[in-house]
């Protein structure tokens, strides 16, 4: 830990005890802020761990981190929850004394996560066997089950524990976890029937609806919509973006299986959960006598089936109250309000008792199953207390009263045990104990729990007394009994300023953590936790095994009045205190950095409030009352011995004597330190800081000295090693080179001899003398052929073969060509085949004849240039009996004036059509198509020559197409006029009408120009693209 002091200005100190101004709340919070900013969420107060919830995942919980803290002294590594867990475990193993880890803090501070991390640490680092592995799994998997049934979303926390939990983890003599046991405290049953705005009911309800299989929900009579259930819509917050109920359901189902729930147990448990939802949907109406009547029979049927009770008896029990007077049983009808109260009371009782049964069932699964129980010994337990923190809301009720009383008791225990551990350490080290002044909250605990005069006793008395007892009569009795107590105030007892903020139905307690106003509304009902007798009778007769176990028939015959909720809680709290007092405690204080649950946000006001009510400044004061720093002599000497010439580099005597020499050399004043039996105690942090800063300076000079010596030694060793290696390598390499040369020379002579002989006999039949040469020639030719074989059908190259392989070469050449042709043909599909056929036709007609033909070669011919949506529907109707094979937009020039007009050229099986929008302008039967003329230049003009035997027949068609090569190829193929396409140079004659002709003149120019010439001809100027 001391090594981190050099960065204390940036990241703060790792132990609040080392703060110079340790009584300053501002200095405390500033140190928290520095560390939180650097994602250092853990800080010590002596042996107490302060944890700030980061609201994000940090990379500090891996197996590597666990190993780093495993078996390491508490102060040798940075603060961490694993350090607390490991310290407790090592104390358990070495001192054989039971341990407990007390985790406290307000809702959302990270208590549940802290307890999970501790369990995960033990699961990974403790010894393993098959049985131990099963126990580890069950310990870990008990968490999601308890969270599902006992946690809920509140305004401050999406996974708030609504019950207190104390878990004992049992270890055997080898240090392996072999069992566990859970105690639960004060489940918030009122949440089952009511939630504040923005809050939810317990997670299990939403998980069941969201993740339950269709078949399961059908058996339970449920549907997936949470809005259909009265107990789930009070908070208007059924869905939460940060909670995935469907995935959580899968985790819970798997966890139930691991902790030994069979399918029947799960089905019975979920039947009870479903019954609570159905119970919330039971509605009442008043009859003419003002008595309540059930109006939702379907819900009663579902309830009766799920709980295996008689539906008639259940219905009557919800609207009647059984009264036993003078040995006679009377059924008194309930009004609307009383029936609703009875329904909600039953729902709370069912859920609360089921939760207790669930904890009991988990305990059976966690119980140690071994036969060698005696081997566990007395020091075999580590307890984890994860309990609600101090709560202060705008509206505080009975639950907050109990929770805050619990925190008062824990604070009292915390101060007592902390002071005791400090005093014990001082006494064991032979240092005088200096009394510490601190606030003793015993006065507040007595105010709540004192017999006859305490608030709980008064509350019980008011619940039990005959007559009309109300919440206000309870408050009046409080005012009469404890009116003079300095930590108790009501509206009636307060001054004028207090009356402005304190309601008439409220009382205020001045807790150690601050003032809290409690509303007495509901105190008597919640304390009585009353369930009508006839409803108990119904549940005792339930055929559901879990419900039957939860409602024992002995309750009906027991004349003794059951303990009230507050008394039960007080008694269970007293037992918890006894458990904790019997163990060696460790503490984790959890702090919530902001209410918005956002990472990297530090709300100073909220944190100051938590620092105050957790008593952290008080804790620092107690720890600093004597000495801020203490370490064993061996550790202190080992760290700082370099600061004194007499102790550096080694001290041969006792560590205590070495430390005495060291502190004298450092100039410590007598009032700054004390020497104990095994430890040195330093009173002021500044003394330790000065020592640490001196060590940091000394490290540089030591490092320089060591570097110089090490570099010299290292380089010398390196040189000697290299020299030796060089000699060895040279010797070995020279021998190797010599042997290789001799072998290579021998091989070369043999090769040359065989090659010469082969060359001499090369033209003779194969024999011993020429076989090597012929094999080489054959191999050489084949390898040359392999590297230079043709890549395509068009490649006619072929290596020249030697005389002996000419025949084989020709055979190979023919096989290679056939193979390439076969491969090429195999890859051609029908569409590509058609494309090639059209390209072949185009080549036959235009290659080396028309200038713009080369530009068309790499472009694929399109099936049609016009879609059906671009051709007028009337035209398509006229062509209905004919198949349209090709369509292209063209420009048609008049035969007389040469005026250009936009047309569509449509080709069918029998004729070509010139179309203007919806009008058919000219039909040219292929039988009347005598020829097609086109120039040799790069223009796109062509003429379709048509027979013209009378005046009714139109003459030739002069057309222009942007895709002239494609268009003419399509026309030639469709009309079967491949040999009738004339490519002209200079001019083209065309027929205007019977006996009349026109001329189109073509000349080469720089750019395309089509216009009527002065001589009446159509003049076309087109650039030349190649010389052909």
Swiss-Prot record:
Species annotation: Aquarana catesbeiana
Any single GO CC term annotated in Swiss-Prot or TrEMBL for this entry: microvillus
Compartments where located: Cytoplasm; Cell membrane; Cell projection, Ruffle membrane; Cytoplasmic vesicle
Name this polypeptide is given: Unconventional myosin-Ic
Residues annotated with N-acetylmethionine modification: 1
Region Actin-binding, residue ranges: 573-595
Pfam families: IQ, Myosin_head, Myosin_TH1
Location, primary (coarse class): cytoplasm
Subunit structure: Interacts (via its IQ motifs) with calmodulin.
Tissue and organ expression note: Expressed in brain and the sacculus of the internal ear.
Keyword Nucleus: no
GO BP: actin filament organization; actin filament-based movement; endocytosis
């Amino acid at each position: 830990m001391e090594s981190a002091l050099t960065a204390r200005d940036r990241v703060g100190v790792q132990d609040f005890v080392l703060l110079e101004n340790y009584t300053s709340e501002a200095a405390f919070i500033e140190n928290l802020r520095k560390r939180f900013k650097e994602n250092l969420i853990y800080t010590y107060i002596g042996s107490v761990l302060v944890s700030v919830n980061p609201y994000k995942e940090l990379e500090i919980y891996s197996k590597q981190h666990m190993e780093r803290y495993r078996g390491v002294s508490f102060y040798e590594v940075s603060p961490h929850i694993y350090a607390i867990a490991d310290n407790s475990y090592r104390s358990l193993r070495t001192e054989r004394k039971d341990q407990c880890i007390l985790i406290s803090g307000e809702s959302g501070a990270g208590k549940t996560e802290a307890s999970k991390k501790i369990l995960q640490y033990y699961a990974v680092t403790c010894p393993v066997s098959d049985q131990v592995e099963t126990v580890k799994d069950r310990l870990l998997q008990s968490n999601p089950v308890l969270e599902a049934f006992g946690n809920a979303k509140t305004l401050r926390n999406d996974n708030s524990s609504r019950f207190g939990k104390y878990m004992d983890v049992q270890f055997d003599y080898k240090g392996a976890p072999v069992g566990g046991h859970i105690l639960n405290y004060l489940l918030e049953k009122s949440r089952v029937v009511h939630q504040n705005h923005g809050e939810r009911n317990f997670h299990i309800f939403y998980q069941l609806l969201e993740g339950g299989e269709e078949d399961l929900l059908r058996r339970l009579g449920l549907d997936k919509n949470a809005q259909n259930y009265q107990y789930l819509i009070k908070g208007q917050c059924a869905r939460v973006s940060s909670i995935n109920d469907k995935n959580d359901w899968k985790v819970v189902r798997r966890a139930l299986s691991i902790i030994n729930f069979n399918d029947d147990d799960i089905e019975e448990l979920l039947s009870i959960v479903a019954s609570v939802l159905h119970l919330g949907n039971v509605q009442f109406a008043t009859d003419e006598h003002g008595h309540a009547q059930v109006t939702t029979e379907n819900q009663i049927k579902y309830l009766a089936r799920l709980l295996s009770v008689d539906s008639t008896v259940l219905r009557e029990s919800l609207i009647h109250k059984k009264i036993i007077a003078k040995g006679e049983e009377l059924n008194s009808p309930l009004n609307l309000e009383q029936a609703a109260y009875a329904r909600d009371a039953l729902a709370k009782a069912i859920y609360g008792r089921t939760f207790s049964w669930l904890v009991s069932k988990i305990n059976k699964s966690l119980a140690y199953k071994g036969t060698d129980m005696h081997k566990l010994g007395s020091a075999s337990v580590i307890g984890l207390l994860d309990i609600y923190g101090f709560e202060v809301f705008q509206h505080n009720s009975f639950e907050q009263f109990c929770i805050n009383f619990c925190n008062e008791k824990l604070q009292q225990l915390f101060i007592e045990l902390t002071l005791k551990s400090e005093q014990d350490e001082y006494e064991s080290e032979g240092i005088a104990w200096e009394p510490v002044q601190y606030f003793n909250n015993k006065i507040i605990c007595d105010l709540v729990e004192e017999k006859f005069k305490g608030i709980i006793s008064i509350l019980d008395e008011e619940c039990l007394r005959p007559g009309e007892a109300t919440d206000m009569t309870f408050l009046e009795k409080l005012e009469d009994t404890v009116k003079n107590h300095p930590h108790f105030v009501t509206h009636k007892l307060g001054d004028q300023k207090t009356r402005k903020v304190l309601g008439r139905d409220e009382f205020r307690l001045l807790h150690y953590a601050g003032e809290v106003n409690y509303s007495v509304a509901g105190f008597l009902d919640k304390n009585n936790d009353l369930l009508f007798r006839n409803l108990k009778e119904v549940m005792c007769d339930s055929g559901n095994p879990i419900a039957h176990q939860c409602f024992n028939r002995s309750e009906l015959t027991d004349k003794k009045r059951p303990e009230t909720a507050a008394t039960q809680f007080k008694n269970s709290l007293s037992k918890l205190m006894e458990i904790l007092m019997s163990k060696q405690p460790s503490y984790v204080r959890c702090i919530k950095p902001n209410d918005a649950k956002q990472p990297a946000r530090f709300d100073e006001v909220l944190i100051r409030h938590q620092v105050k009510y957790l008593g952290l400044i008080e804790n620092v004061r107690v720890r600093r009352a004597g000495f801020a720093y203490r370490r064993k002599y061996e550790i202190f000497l080992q760290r700082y011995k370099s600061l004194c010439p007499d102790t550096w580099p080694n001290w041969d005597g006792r560590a205590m004597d070495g430390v005495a020499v060291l502190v004298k050399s450092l100039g410590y004043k007598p009032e700054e330190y004390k020497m104990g039996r095994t430890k040195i105690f330093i009173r002021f942090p500044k003394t330790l800081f000065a020592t640490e800063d001196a060590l940091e300076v000394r490290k540089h000079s030591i490092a320089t000295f060591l570097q110089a010596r090490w570099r010299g030694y290292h380089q010398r060793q390196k040189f000697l090693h290299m020299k030796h290696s060089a000699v060895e390598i040279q010797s070995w390499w020279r021998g190797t080179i010599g042997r290789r040369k001799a072998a290579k020379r021998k091989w070369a002579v043999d090769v040359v001899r065989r090659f010469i002989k082969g060359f001499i006999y090369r033209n003779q039949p194969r024999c011993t003398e020429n076989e090597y040469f012929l094999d080489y020639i054959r191999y050489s030719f084949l390898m040359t052929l392999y590297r230079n074989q043709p890549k395509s059908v068009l490649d006619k190259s072929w290596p020249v073969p030697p005389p002996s392989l000419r025949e084989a070469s020709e055979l190979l050449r023919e096989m290679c060509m056939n193979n390439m042709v076969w491969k090429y043909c195999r890859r051609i599909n029908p569409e590509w085949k058609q494309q090639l056929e059209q390209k072949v036709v185009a080549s036959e007609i235009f290659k080396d004849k028309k200038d713009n033909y080369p530009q068309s070669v790499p472009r694929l011919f399109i099936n049609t240039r016009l879609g059906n949506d671009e051709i007028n529907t009337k035209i398509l109707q006229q062509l209905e009996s004919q198949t349209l094979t090709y369509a292209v937009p063209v420009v048609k020039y008049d035969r007389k004036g040469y005026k250009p007009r936009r047309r569509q050229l449509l080709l069918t099986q029998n004729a070509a059509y010139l179309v203007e929008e919806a009008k058919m302008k000219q039909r040219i039967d292929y039988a009347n198509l005598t020829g097609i003329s086109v120039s040799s230049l790069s223009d796109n003009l062509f003429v379709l020559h048509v027979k013209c035997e009378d005046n009714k027949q139109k003459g030739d068609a002069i057309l222009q197409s942007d895709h002239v090569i494609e268009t003419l190829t399509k026309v030639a193929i469709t009309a079967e006029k491949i040999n009738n396409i004339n490519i002209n140079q200079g001019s083209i004659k065309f027929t205007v009408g019977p006996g009349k002709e026109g001329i189109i003149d073509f000349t080469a120019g720089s750019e395309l120009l089509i216009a009527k010439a002065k001589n009446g001809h159509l003049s076309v100027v087109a650039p030349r693209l190649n010389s052909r």
